[in-house]
């Protein structure tokens, strides 16, 4: 299931697919640690087109456009299609209030597009959901 375009970016550690990343002072990326941090993107395991790949093992495929699976901070049953989300602790996404969207529109990581059921998804069950939700970035 190929749903997004990624750019390989240098990371601190090895963030798992579905984790939200923020930039450090040196330009390396790391998992978000608090709500409303300015995020760069979400690590993807469903990409179909990639840019910037090299043999460097500290590179992660970061979704730049399309749909990507992301770990929710709150209970996933509280998310609805169309909800805007921001970075949250542990590299997760959090629901944004209408007030937060007005004050910090630049902090929107994406918009919820699907809350999948089951453990896998795709024609051949090739995508492991692992409690994640789909967002459009």
How should these model regions be labeled?
Residues 1-137:
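Extracellular receptor-binding modules and their adjoining Ser/Thr/Gly/Asp/Asn-rich linkers
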